[in-house]
């Protein structure tokens, strides 16, 4: 590919996929601070958003080999970039880069691509759940405790929420075992295993394992000896159906492209809006802090907020100089600021000290 991105400190911020479900939320958050360029496959879809935000619209179809060129101050990828086109162009042009779309194996590949290229500008791989918000909260809790031995994440997916088609891409990975850190050792686990019930906010939710990038990065960045992420759904029937499909082996024998629609159709039925909610438990020694994150504006809004905070970080506009090279969201200079940064966008963070030896209704594990 011959894409060219050039760094211009006074230039606009480029949002690749900028008028999709998450991109729309991010554009609205970012527009008061920076001029924007929004790209996608069909610019007509972004016309109303461009008028609302004052953004420029351009076509950049990542599946089309036609080259793209722009002079920008930073770029955020909020759409799948399977061939690393945006990443490579940003590194080549010295442009600060944020990505919130990659699942674990693609994040690992991106980190390798970036490391080999030797970037001089920041490369923020912020694909932990909800655009890195889980990792930000884990870092905040770890900072309060003086470290993080274990990190347990429990997600409650609201089936009434708005969602783009990429949001259920994790369904394609439910037939693939993955590696986690447990008690300081690497273990291979099955998706949807270790099911249990966890109280997330006021709701007892059945959750099971899912492959997410923070389970790879948190042991590296926070030195967590155990990192676990599980997911459950607002409909107990949907959770039960998913677990039943797993027991029948559907996600093993139905891994091919011809089954993509069937896999994603188990959950992809976007509604008019719901609440994004997750719980993060961090333990250091005998102390555990439990945080519940609630965003009444939904998961697209919460993911966009993670992208916005990543953008501020790579631009050095969060009270500290911009980093260089590959970084993850939890590597932030001021973790104590996370609650106020979330609250500024209407996201509620409640932290409490957990009672030792809590059962399933307590800790996310």
Q: Where on the chain are the PLM-derived regions?
A:
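Conserved beta-strand positions in the Rossmann-like core of class I SAM-dependent methyltransferases
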Residues: 37-38, 98
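C-terminal active-site/capping subdomain that shapes the small-molecule cofactor and substrate pocket
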Residues: 245-365
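N-terminal Rossmann NAD(P)H-binding glycine-rich loop of SDR-like oxidoreductase domains
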Residues: 13-30
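N-terminal Rossmann-fold cofactor-binding loop
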Residues: 39-43, 61-62
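Rossmann-fold NAD(P)-binding glycine/threonine-rich loop
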Residues: 101-121
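ADP-ribose/adenylate-binding Rossmann-like module
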Residues: 89-107
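Active-site-lining helix/loop region of Rossmann-like oxidoreductase modules
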Residues: 16, 143-272, 276-284
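Conserved Rossmann-fold cofactor-binding substructure of NAD(P)-dependent oxidoreductases
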Residues: 59-73, 77, 81-82
